[in-house]
Every structure is written in structure tokens, then in C-alpha cells.
UniProtKB/Swiss-Prot annotation:
Region (Disordered): 614-678
Source organism of the structure: Pseudomonas aeruginosa (strain ATCC 15692 / DSM 22644 / CIP 104116 / JCM 14847 / LMG 12228 / 1C / PRS 101 / PAO1)
Family matches, as InterPro entries: Gp5/Vgr_OB, Gp5_Vgr_C, T6SS_RhsGE_Vgr_subset, T6SS_Vgr_RhsGE, T6SS_VgrG/RHS, Vgr_OB-fold_dom_sf
Function recorded in the entry: Part of the H1 type VI secretion system (H1-T6SS) specialized secretion system, which delivers several virulence factors in both prokaryotic and eukaryotic cells during infection. Allows the delivery of the Tse7 toxin to target cells where it exerts toxicity through its nuclease domain.
Designated name of the protein: Type VI secretion system spike protein VgrG1b
Keywords: Secreted
Length: 741
């Protein structure tokens, strides 16, 4: 006999045609926030139906309601099979599931940034080609800076996000499609037509002419009364982020608290919503009412009011949070004892005033150990960081990003030390490979804990040849080449130990107290340009052996107060050209033994005030050419023993005022040629005993007793004026002749 569906309670619409398959039995399960599953037992006259003609394709059932309209159960054929059959009909089994279930068949590793969870969910749906969904959300949701789908199916990913945010879904069925409705509050639900109120009839009074319930069961269970969450925000390390939400119940043991960390928030208002969501998910299980009957038009997500139940407080509005269906249709087999079509449903309900939230049952992905990633940033940059020294990376598993500044969130970097405005700082640079760990194993919470070399980012020292070398070598940025770097390197090779420091440009060393340098052998210091040494207090420099200072051009040495140079043995000072010594006040130069000053050309010595030269023994001063001594005021020269002045040519002494000479004992003056003495005014020559003037055979001798003897060959007295001879005693004139006039 040919199969016909027009008069049957439930009709089947499949990709194989309208009359090819007919329903014999259906068992279905629905729940808010969970995919439905409809298990169908179908019959067909064709035992050779291609299963692939069904698998993965949409199919639907149409259930006739009491008013003649039809309720649809639409889904995707997730599984199908064929049994041995019974009699003249072939037997097929089909499982219908929502298109959302197909997300269990795809997985990814993917990063979402700066998006709210509803937007992430809808993007996942659209990217997989699904558009049959509706946004009925009414709450506000925070923006996630960073959210990772990591080694999990797309279904698990969106499910755990919805569970965390308190979002659930249900399905509205049409003949040719089913629509996923994202919900978070009472306003997302409504009663289906003609089902705003459904009566309860005891089994003994069952009335089949209209939908009703005939079995009622209520259960209550102790739940936690409050939930506290806590978290930490590194940008506000002192902020108290603990939040608490509670729902009071009147029964005993209703106030046991729950506490969890981390709450996955950094703003308290977000934490409060998370805490409220989780306590509401628990309290939605506090009371459940299960109703069994034949209400064909009711399913998950629907509202209705129960009426006629003997316990009046139960005649209230309910939200259907779960449903199970059983449908059996009459058999076609001849002699099969045909049974009529039967429909029965069992609804799991909560008070419509109780907020519904899904329990967080989907496991969070765990990163089981550290990973490596590559530091990224904008094109043309070498270092890309923020005020906290964070960087961005490209994970090797991420096939969606472009390896640029948008590849990840800012990721904190572990440093060797991290204090308040002190510590170490080494910012990973673009292209470097870093080790990434994850706080609590959460892929949403990466932290960089190390860096590693690879075949492109190679080691700074050739290995294994330089295995004894360690240190730190940087690279100048931007545009630095291998020749541009700063470096601190230690060589530990026995017998060749070395500490090497290289500054690519400037090196600044600050020591706030003492600094000690010890060099066991030689020290060489080369400065290609200028050197400035500023010692604000005393400086002591000790050279135990020889010191050689070579100055290629000029040298200026300025001593603000006193300078003392003590030389234990000899000192040789050789000035190739000019030397100028300027002393503002006093200068004392003490030579314990000999001093020799050799001046190849001119020497000018200018003393602005006094100069004292004290020579304990001998002093020899030799001037090869001219010497000029100019003294602006007084000059005192004291020689404790002998002084010899040997002048190879002329000596000229010019005294602007008076000259006074004191000789303690004898004085000898020897003039090789002429001697001229020119006195502008008076001339006094005073001798204690006598004065003798001698030239050849002539002499004048004056004694202290007053006698004067003029001795010579011819003596002439020639006076241009008068000549007076006066004596207190005799005047004696002797001669061969005495001539007058």
C-alpha cells in the first residue's frame, strides 16, 4: 500500500520527497542553552534510500495541533541509519539537531579583540555561514580586550562565553528553518498562540479534546545563598575588586557562600554582573516543576500559566526551560493491531519571575605549559611597546592574523627585577622569539616569561667555539647594523679571562660615594678626542715608578689655590716651544738638590706681586742669549752663600727708582773692558777704613783718619774757575822747580 501523510498526526518533510518517509516514533529533548535532539524512527517502502541524501541536510516534522494548525520541529540530519525493517516497510533512524550542533564538528585557534561577547558569538556564526539567529538580549555586556578560542570546537567556545555572561538560547521552529534566539531575560520569551493558559486535569478527569497536564511534580534543592568573586588589575594593583551577590531564601542552610578567583574582570561593575549571573544560575535550580501532559504547542523558551491545580500557589506563570516529547503513530502493517497516534510531553519549568542562567558546565581550554611566539609590530618599527613595557606577539597557531600590531593584546613581559621605578628592563624586539606562559593556564591571560634564539635570530657569539663567553649584546635602533651595538661580555676561558664593555656612543658612570679601581698589571687608556676630569675636592695621584705624560699640542693647568709638586729625585721639564706660568699670588719653588733650567730661546717670567727664590746650596743659571727680568714693584734676592753670575754677552740692569745692595763681607767686581757709572744726582761712596782708586801707576788713597794721598807720575790740577787750597796747618810744596804763572 502507498504511504500517505495527509491524515497523520505528524508529517515528515525530508530532502527525499514528501511521501518517501513517514514517522513511526519520535523522542525529542530540548533545554534552554543546549542543542535539541529529535530521535526519529521512520518507515519507507523503499529499502534502498541513499543515506547521504539525508545526512547533513535539513528535515522537519509537522505536528498537528488541536486547532488544526501545525507545530514544526526543524533540524539538520546529524545521523541516520537503516535497520532490518519489519514486514513490508524498511526501517530508518534519523537524529535531527540544530545547525548550532554543527559547531561541534569544527574547531579553531583564534583571537578576538575589543569585542563584546554577543558580537563574538554572532561573528563565529556568520563566519561559519549561519544566519538563522536572532538577538533578543536586553542586558549590557562588557567589551573584552582579548578573547581566545584555543584548541576547542566552535560550539564549546561560544557555549562557555554564553555561560560566563549569563546568555542562553532557545529555538523557534518554522517549516523550512529553525532560528536560534539569544536571550538573557524574561522579555525574550512569549506564549505561543492559544497557550497562554494551560489547565491541569487529574488523570481520572482527563479530557482529550484540549491540551492539558495530568501530572505535576515540584522539587526544591538547597543552593548556595551567595557568591563572591575577586580579581587583580595590574594597572591598579591596590584596587579592591572583590564583589558579592546573594539571593536570600527562607529555608534553613540557605546562606552558604561560594568564593572564586580569578573572576576574569578588572572593573567592579563587571564583577558584580558575573557574580549575579553565577548565583542566578544556581538559584534557577532551587525549584523545578515538572508537568506531564498533552500540551502539543509548548516547548523550551515558551511562557504559559498553569490553571486548575489544587494547590493554588502553583497556578502561576512558568517558563519552560526543558522539554521531552514522545510521539507514536499508528502502524501500517496488516494485522499489526494498529494503535492510534499518541503525543506526550514532559516540561521542566521554573517560575517566570526567576531569572534563568545556564550553569558553567563547558570546560575552559587549558594551555598545558609554555609556548613560544614571535614579537610583532607595525611595519617599519623595530621596537613596539607601551608604557608598561608590554609587547604584542604572533602565536604559531594563529592562522588568521597578519603578524602586525593587531595580532594580540598587549602582553606583559617578565623582567629580572621589577620595583617601583627601579629594576631591569629588556623589551623584546620585533622578530624575536619569546616564551609565553599563561596565568592559570588561561589562553586569555598570556605573560612573557623568557626569550629564545632560533635559526634566524641567532646567538651573538659563534658557538660552540665561544662557549666560555657570556654577556649581553644589544643592537642600535632604528636602522642598526651588526656593527652598531652596546655590549657587556665576559670571557671565562682559563688564562684568557676578560670583561669587555662596549658603548656604541656615550658611556656615563655615576658613583654616589666611593669608587675603587685595582689593576693588577698594565692599564692603557686611549681617548680619541677630548677628556675632562672634574674633581670637586682633593685628588691624590701616586705613581710608584715612572710617569710619562705626553701632550701633543697645548696643555693648560689651573690650580685655584696652592700647588705642591714634590719630586724625590730628578725632574726634567722639556718645553718644545713656549711656556707661560702665571701665578696669581705666591709661589714657592723648593729644590732639595740641583735644578737645571735650559731655555733654547726666550723666557719671560712675569711676577705680579712678590717672588722669593731660596736656594739651599748652589744655583747655576745659564742664559744662552738674552734674559729680561721685569719686576713691577720690589725684588729681594737673598743668597745664603756664594752667587756667581756669568753673562756671556751684555747685561743691562734698569731700575726705575732706588737700588740698594748689601754685601756681608767682601765684594769683587771685575769688568773685562770699560765700566761706566752714570748718576743723575748725588753719588756717595762710603768705606769703613779706606778708599783706593788705582789705575796703572796712579792712585788716590783716602783713609778714615782723613789723610788723602794722590800718587802718580804727572799730576795736573786744572780748574776752569778758582782753585782754593786751605789748610789749618802748613802747606808744603816741594819740586825741582816751583813755577807760578
Amino acid at each position: 500500500m502507498a504511504l500517505a501523510q495527509q491524515t497523520r498526526l505528524v508529517r515528515v518533510d525530508s530532502p527525499l520527497g514528501a511521501e518517501v518517509l513517514q514517522l513511526q516514533r519520535m523522542e525529542g529533548r530540548e533545554e534552554l542553552g543546549r542543542p535539541f535532539a529529535y530521535e526519529l524512527e521512520l518507515i519507507s517502502e523503499n529499502p534502498d534510500l541513499p543515506l547521504d541524501g539525508l545526512l547533513g541536510k535539513p528535515a522537519s516534522l509537522a505536528l498537528e495541533l488541536h486547532d488544526g494548525s501545525r507545530r514544526h520541529f526543524h533540524g539538520i540530519v546529524a545521523a541516520c541509519s537503516q535497520g532490518s525493517g519489519n514486514g513490508q516497510f524498511a526501517s530508518y533512524q534519523v537524529t535531527l539537531r540544530p545547525w548550532l550542533w554543527l559547531l561541534t564538528r569544527t574547531s579553531d585557534c583564534r583571537i578576538f579583540q575589543n569585542q563584546k561577547v554577543p558580537d563574538i558569538i554572532k561573528q563565529v556564526f556568520r563566519d561559519l555561514g549561519f544566519s538563522d539567529f536572532e538577538d533578543a538580549l536586553s542586558r549590557s555586556y562588557r567589551e573584552w580586550e582579548y578573547c581566545v578560542q584555543y584548541r576547542e570546537t566552535s560550539f564549546d567556545f561560544v557555549s562557555r562565553l554564553m555561560e560566563q555572561e549569563g546568555i542562553y538560547y532557545w529555538f523557534r521552529h518554522e517549516q523550512s528553518r529553525h532560528i536560534l534566539v539569544l536571550s538573557d531575560a524574561y522579555g525574550a520569551h512569549q506564549s505561543p498562540p492559544n497557550y497562554a493558559s494551560v489547565p491541569y486535569y487529574p488523570p481520572t478527569l482527563e479530557q482529550r479534546e484540549r491540551d492539558h497536564f495530568y501530572d505535576w511534580h515540584m522539587a526544591r534543592e538547597v543552593q548556595s545563598g551567595s557568591l563572591s568573586l575577586n580579581d587583580y588589575d595590574f594597572q591598579r594593583p591596590g584596587a579592591r575588586l572583590e564583589v558579592r551577590s546573594n539571593i536570600a531564601r527562607s529555608h534553613a542552610a540557605a546562606d552558604y557562600p561560594l568564593y572564586d578567583y580569578p573572576g576574569e574582570y578588572v572593573q567592579s561593575q563587571d564583577g558584580e554582573q558575573y557574580a549575579r549571573t553565577r548565583i542566578e544560575a544556581l538559584q534557577a535550580r532551587y525549584e523545578r516543576v515538572r508537568l506531564r501532559g498533552r500540551a502539543r504547542g509548548l516547548g523550551s523558551g515558551h511562557l504559559f500559566k498553569l490553571s486548575g491545580y489544587p494547590r493554588e500557589d502553583q497556578n502561576r506563570e512558568y517558563l519552560v526551560v526543558g522539554a521531552e516529547y514522545r510521539v507514536v503513530q499508528e502502524l501500517y502493517e496488516t494485522g499489526g493491531g494498529g494503535v492510534g497516534a499518541q503525543f506526550e510531553s514532559e516540561l521542566d519549568c521554573i517560575d517566570a519571575g526567576q531569572a534563568y542562567r545556564p550553569l558553567p558546565t563547558t570546560p575552559l581550554p587549558i594551555v598545558r605549559g609554555p609556548q613560544t611566539a614571535v614579537v610583532v609590530g607595525p611595519k617599519g618599527e623595530e621596537i613596539w611597546t607601551d608604557q608598561y613595557g608590554r609587547v604584542k606577539v604572533h602565536f604559531h597557531w594563529d592562522r588568521h592574523d597578519q603578524s602586525n600590531e593587531n595580532s594580540s593584546c598587549w602582553i606583559r613581559v617578565s623582567q629580572a627585577w621589577a620595583g617601583k621605578n627601579w629594576g631591569s628592563m629588556q623589551i623584546p624586539r620585533i622578530g624575536q622569539e619569546v616564551i609565553v606562559s599563561f596565568l592559570e593556564g588561561d589562553p586569555d591571560r598570556p605573560i612573557i616569561t623568557g626569550r629564545v634564539y632560533n635559526a634566524e635570530q641567532t646567538v651573538p657569539y659563534e658557538l660552540p667555539a665561544n662557549a666560555t663567553q657570556s654577556g649581553m649584546k644589544s643592537r642600535s635602533s632604528k636602522g642598526g647594523t651588526p656593527a652598531n651595538f652596546n655590549e657587556i661580555r665576559m670571557e671565562d676561558k682559563k688564562g684568557a679571562e676578560q670583561l669587555f664593555i662596549h658603548a656604541e656612543k656615550n658611556q656615563d658612570i655615576e658613583v654616589e660615594n666611593d669608587e675603587t679601581h685595582w689593576v693588577g698589571h698594565d692599564r692603557t687608556k686611549t681617548i680619541d678626542h677630548d677628556e675632562t676630569v672634574h674633581v670637586k675636592h682633593d685628588r691624590t695621584e701616586t705613581v710608584d715608578n715612572n710617569e710619562t705624560i705626553t701632550i701633543g699640542v697645548d696643555r693648560t693647568e689651573k690650580v685655584g689655590n696652592n700647588e705642591k709638586i714634590s719630586i724625590g729625585a730628578n725632574r726634567t721639564e722639556d718645553v718644545g716651544s713656549n711656556e707661560t706660568i702665571s701665578i696669581g699670588v705666591d709661589r714657592t719653588e723648593k729644590v732639595g738638590s740641583n735644578e737645571k733650567i735650559s731655555i733654547g730661546a726666550n723666557r719671560t717670567e712675569d711676577v705680579g706681586n712678590d717672588e722669593t727664590i731660596s736656594i739651599g746650596a748652589n744655583r747655576s743659571e745659564s742664559v744662552g742669549n738674552n734674559e729680561t727680568i721685569s719686576i713691577g714693584a720690589d725684588r729681594s734676592e737673598s743668597v745664603g752663600a756664594n752667587e756667581t753670575i756669568d753673562i756671556g754677552g751684555n747685561q743691562s740692569t734698569s731700575i726705575g727708582k732706588n737700588e740698594s745692595r748689601s754685601v756681608g763681607q767682601g765684594r769683587d767686581t771685575s769688568v773685562g773692558k770699560d765700566d761706566s757709572l752714570d748718576v743723575g744726582k748725588s753719588f756717595t761712596l762710603n768705606a769703613g777704613d779706606s778708599i783706593t782708586l788705582v789705575t796703572g801707576a796712579a792712585s788716590i788713597r783716602m783713609k778714615k783718619d782723613g789723610s788723602i794721598v794722590i800718587s802718580g807720575k804727572n799730576i795736573t790740577i786744572d780748574g776752569s774757575g778758582a782753585i782754593n787750597v786751605k789748610a789749618d796747618k802748613n802747606v808744603v810744596v816741594k819740586g825741582r822747580k816751583i813755577l807760578q804763572n
